[in-house]
Amino acid sequence: MAARLRKALDQYGVEATSAVSTGPKPEVYDFYQGPLTIGLVPRQYRQARIARMQAVADFARNAGIPAVQGHCGFIPENPSDELYRETVAAIRTVAEYCRKNRRSFRCETGQETPITLVRAIRDVGLDNVGVNFDVANLIMYGKANPLDAVDVLAPYIQGVHAKDGLYPTDPRNLGAEVPIGEGKVNFPALIEKLRRIGYHNPLTIEREISGEKQRADVLKAKAYLEKLIG
Protein backbone atom coordinates (compact mmCIF):
# COMPACT_ATOMS: atom_id res chain seq x y z
CA MET A 1 0.00 0.00 0.00
CA ALA A 2 2.84 2.40 0.81
CA ALA A 3 4.35 1.90 -2.64
CA ARG A 4 0.99 2.51 -4.32
CA LEU A 5 0.50 5.69 -2.31
CA ARG A 6 3.99 6.93 -3.19
CA LYS A 7 3.33 6.28 -6.87
CA ALA A 8 0.01 8.16 -6.74
CA LEU A 9 1.55 11.11 -4.89
CA ASP A 10 4.28 11.40 -7.49
CA GLN A 11 1.87 10.96 -10.38
CA TYR A 12 -0.46 13.74 -9.25
CA GLY A 13 2.11 16.07 -7.72
CA VAL A 14 0.76 15.84 -4.17
CA GLU A 15 3.02 16.46 -1.18
CA ALA A 16 2.23 14.27 1.83
CA THR A 17 3.58 16.23 4.79
CA SER A 18 2.81 13.67 7.50
CA ALA A 19 1.16 10.34 8.22
CA VAL A 20 -1.55 10.61 10.88
CA SER A 21 -1.84 7.94 13.56
CA THR A 22 -5.22 7.40 15.21
CA GLY A 23 -6.67 4.63 17.35
CA PRO A 24 -7.07 1.88 18.19
CA LYS A 25 -10.47 2.92 19.46
CA PRO A 26 -12.16 3.98 21.67
CA GLU A 27 -11.49 7.68 21.16
CA VAL A 28 -14.18 9.98 22.51
CA TYR A 29 -13.67 13.66 21.75
CA ASP A 30 -15.27 15.43 24.70
CA PHE A 31 -14.17 16.72 28.10
CA TYR A 32 -15.39 13.74 30.14
CA GLN A 33 -14.41 10.63 28.19
CA GLY A 34 -11.62 12.32 26.23
CA PRO A 35 -9.06 12.24 29.07
CA LEU A 36 -9.85 8.53 29.53
CA THR A 37 -9.68 7.47 25.88
CA ILE A 38 -7.49 9.75 23.72
CA GLY A 39 -3.82 9.42 22.91
CA LEU A 40 -0.99 8.01 25.03
CA VAL A 41 -2.24 9.21 28.41
CA PRO A 42 -4.79 6.43 29.22
CA ARG A 43 -2.88 3.45 30.64
CA GLN A 44 -5.21 0.77 29.34
CA TYR A 45 -4.77 1.82 25.69
CA ARG A 46 -1.20 3.07 25.79
CA GLN A 47 0.70 0.04 24.53
CA ALA A 48 -1.72 -0.48 21.64
CA ARG A 49 -1.39 3.19 20.68
CA ILE A 50 2.41 3.01 20.80
CA ALA A 51 2.31 -0.03 18.54
CA ARG A 52 -0.03 1.76 16.13
CA MET A 53 2.23 4.82 15.97
CA GLN A 54 5.25 2.62 15.33
CA ALA A 55 3.39 0.87 12.51
CA VAL A 56 2.53 4.27 11.02
CA ALA A 57 6.22 5.21 11.26
CA ASP A 58 7.08 2.12 9.21
CA PHE A 59 4.42 3.08 6.67
CA ALA A 60 5.70 6.67 6.51
CA ARG A 61 9.24 5.44 5.85
CA ASN A 62 8.09 3.11 3.08
CA ALA A 63 5.91 5.82 1.51
CA GLY A 64 8.55 8.53 1.74
CA ILE A 65 6.49 10.68 4.13
CA PRO A 66 8.72 12.72 6.46
CA ALA A 67 6.71 12.73 9.68
CA VAL A 68 4.23 10.89 11.89
CA GLN A 69 1.70 12.89 13.86
CA GLY A 70 -1.02 12.21 16.38
CA HIS A 71 -2.72 13.35 19.55
CA CYS A 72 -0.79 12.51 22.69
CA GLY A 73 -3.90 13.09 24.81
CA PHE A 74 -4.86 15.25 27.78
CA ILE A 75 -1.29 15.55 29.06
CA PRO A 76 -1.48 16.46 32.77
CA GLU A 77 -0.60 20.03 33.68
CA ASN A 78 1.17 18.87 36.82
CA PRO A 79 4.66 17.60 35.91
CA SER A 80 4.76 15.66 39.19
CA ASP A 81 1.69 13.64 38.17
CA GLU A 82 2.65 10.01 37.51
CA LEU A 83 0.51 10.06 34.37
CA TYR A 84 2.60 12.97 33.08
CA ARG A 85 5.84 11.04 33.54
CA GLU A 86 4.35 7.92 31.95
CA THR A 87 3.08 9.91 28.96
CA VAL A 88 6.46 11.54 28.42
CA ALA A 89 8.07 8.09 28.47
CA ALA A 90 5.51 6.84 25.93
CA ILE A 91 6.14 9.80 23.61
CA ARG A 92 9.86 9.12 23.91
CA THR A 93 9.35 5.48 22.91
CA VAL A 94 7.41 6.54 19.81
CA ALA A 95 9.85 9.31 18.92
CA GLU A 96 12.86 7.01 19.25
CA TYR A 97 11.22 4.55 16.87
CA CYS A 98 10.46 7.36 14.43
CA ARG A 99 14.06 8.52 14.62
CA LYS A 100 15.29 5.02 13.72
CA ASN A 101 13.06 5.35 10.65
CA ARG A 102 14.48 8.84 9.98
CA ARG A 103 11.06 10.39 10.60
CA SER A 104 9.99 13.19 12.92
CA PHE A 105 7.14 12.82 15.39
CA ARG A 106 4.67 15.68 15.65
CA CYS A 107 2.37 16.12 18.63
CA GLU A 108 -0.95 17.54 17.47
CA THR A 109 -2.15 20.48 19.55
CA GLY A 110 -5.52 20.39 21.25
CA GLN A 111 -5.99 18.55 24.51
CA GLU A 112 -3.15 20.21 26.40
CA THR A 113 -2.10 23.79 27.03
CA PRO A 114 0.78 25.00 24.85
CA ILE A 115 3.22 25.31 27.76
CA THR A 116 2.42 21.78 28.92
CA LEU A 117 3.18 20.51 25.42
CA VAL A 118 6.49 22.40 25.39
CA ARG A 119 7.35 20.94 28.81
CA ALA A 120 6.59 17.42 27.59
CA ILE A 121 8.65 17.86 24.41
CA ARG A 122 11.63 19.15 26.40
CA ASP A 123 11.31 16.32 28.91
CA VAL A 124 11.23 13.79 26.06
CA GLY A 125 14.59 15.25 25.09
CA LEU A 126 14.80 14.17 21.43
CA ASP A 127 15.45 16.49 18.51
CA ASN A 128 12.94 14.85 16.16
CA VAL A 129 9.88 15.80 18.24
CA GLY A 130 7.84 18.80 17.13
CA VAL A 131 4.30 20.12 16.87
CA ASN A 132 1.53 19.96 14.35
CA PHE A 133 -0.10 23.28 15.12
CA ASP A 134 -3.86 22.74 14.80
CA VAL A 135 -5.04 26.28 15.33
CA ALA A 136 -8.73 25.45 15.72
CA ASN A 137 -8.16 22.68 18.25
CA LEU A 138 -6.62 25.18 20.64
CA ILE A 139 -9.86 27.15 20.52
CA MET A 140 -12.28 24.21 20.45
CA TYR A 141 -10.67 22.69 23.56
CA GLY A 142 -10.53 26.10 25.24
CA LYS A 143 -6.77 25.80 25.75
CA ALA A 144 -5.36 28.91 24.05
CA ASN A 145 -5.72 31.67 21.52
CA PRO A 146 -3.64 30.42 18.57
CA LEU A 147 -1.98 33.82 18.09
CA ASP A 148 -0.64 33.69 21.63
CA ALA A 149 0.20 30.00 21.29
CA VAL A 150 2.61 30.79 18.44
CA ASP A 151 4.78 32.64 20.96
CA VAL A 152 4.99 29.53 23.14
CA LEU A 153 5.27 26.84 20.48
CA ALA A 154 7.28 28.67 17.79
CA PRO A 155 10.51 26.62 17.99
CA TYR A 156 8.58 23.38 17.59
CA ILE A 157 6.00 24.14 14.88
CA GLN A 158 6.67 21.80 11.96
CA GLY A 159 3.20 21.67 10.42
CA VAL A 160 -0.02 23.69 10.57
CA HIS A 161 -3.63 22.57 10.27
CA ALA A 162 -5.71 25.39 8.79
CA LYS A 163 -9.05 24.87 10.48
CA ASP A 164 -11.53 27.12 12.26
CA GLY A 165 -13.68 26.72 15.33
CA LEU A 166 -15.50 28.23 18.28
CA TYR A 167 -14.70 28.23 21.97
CA PRO A 168 -16.61 25.70 24.10
CA THR A 169 -19.53 26.96 26.17
CA ASP A 170 -20.85 23.54 27.24
CA PRO A 171 -18.54 22.11 29.93
CA ARG A 172 -19.02 18.60 28.54
CA ASN A 173 -18.47 19.16 24.83
CA LEU A 174 -15.82 20.77 22.64
CA GLY A 175 -16.50 23.96 20.77
CA ALA A 176 -17.83 23.51 17.25
CA GLU A 177 -15.67 23.26 14.15
CA VAL A 178 -16.84 25.72 11.48
CA PRO A 179 -15.70 26.66 7.96
CA ILE A 180 -12.53 28.74 7.77
CA GLY A 181 -13.40 32.40 8.16
CA GLU A 182 -16.50 31.75 10.28
CA GLY A 183 -14.80 30.98 13.60
CA LYS A 184 -12.48 32.58 16.12
CA VAL A 185 -9.16 32.04 14.31
CA ASN A 186 -7.76 35.35 13.04
CA PHE A 187 -6.14 33.95 9.91
CA PRO A 188 -4.71 37.24 8.54
CA ALA A 189 -2.88 37.88 11.82
CA LEU A 190 -1.94 34.23 12.21
CA ILE A 191 -0.32 33.96 8.79
CA GLU A 192 1.61 37.16 9.39
CA LYS A 193 2.83 35.84 12.74
CA LEU A 194 3.87 32.52 11.21
CA ARG A 195 5.85 34.47 8.63
CA ARG A 196 7.60 36.42 11.40
CA ILE A 197 8.79 33.25 13.13
CA GLY A 198 10.12 31.90 9.84
CA TYR A 199 7.49 29.24 9.19
CA HIS A 200 7.50 28.35 5.49
CA ASN A 201 6.00 24.85 5.54
CA PRO A 202 2.53 24.06 4.16
CA LEU A 203 -0.81 25.06 5.62
CA THR A 204 -2.88 21.87 5.48
CA ILE A 205 -6.61 22.58 5.23
CA GLU A 206 -8.63 20.34 7.52
CA ARG A 207 -12.43 20.15 7.48
CA GLU A 208 -13.66 17.27 9.62
CA ILE A 209 -16.98 16.57 7.95
CA SER A 210 -17.82 14.55 4.83
CA GLY A 211 -19.71 14.88 1.58
CA GLU A 212 -20.14 17.77 -0.82
CA LYS A 213 -20.10 20.42 1.90
CA GLN A 214 -16.63 19.30 2.94
CA ARG A 215 -15.40 19.67 -0.64
CA ALA A 216 -17.04 23.08 -1.01
CA ASP A 217 -15.64 24.33 2.30
CA VAL A 218 -12.12 23.12 1.45
CA LEU A 219 -12.17 24.84 -1.95
CA LYS A 220 -13.47 28.05 -0.39
CA ALA A 221 -10.79 27.88 2.32
CA LYS A 222 -8.09 27.30 -0.30
CA ALA A 223 -9.10 30.43 -2.21
CA TYR A 224 -9.28 32.47 1.01
CA LEU A 225 -5.87 31.35 2.27
CA GLU A 226 -4.20 31.85 -1.10
CA LYS A 227 -5.29 35.50 -1.04
CA LEU A 228 -3.83 35.94 2.44
CA ILE A 229 -0.56 34.23 1.57
CA GLY A 230 -0.21 36.22 -1.65
List where the protein language model places each region.
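Generic serine detector
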Residues: S18-S21, S80, S104, S210
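Histidine-acidic metal/acid-base catalytic patches
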Residues: A3, D10, R92, K100, ...
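Glycine-rich, aromatic-flanked loop segments that form ligand/cofactor-binding clefts
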Residues: L5-E27
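Active-site loop/turn elements of alpha/beta-hydrolase fold enzymes
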Residues: S21, C72-G73, G110, A162-G165
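Active-site acidic/histidine proton-transfer and metal-coordination neighborhood
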Residues: Q11, P26-G130, R215
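Metal-dependent catalytic neighborhoods of phosphoester/phosphodiester hydrolases
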Residues: M1-A3, S80
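Hydrophobic residues within beta-strands of alpha/beta enzymes
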Residues: T17-A19, V68, V160, P202-L203
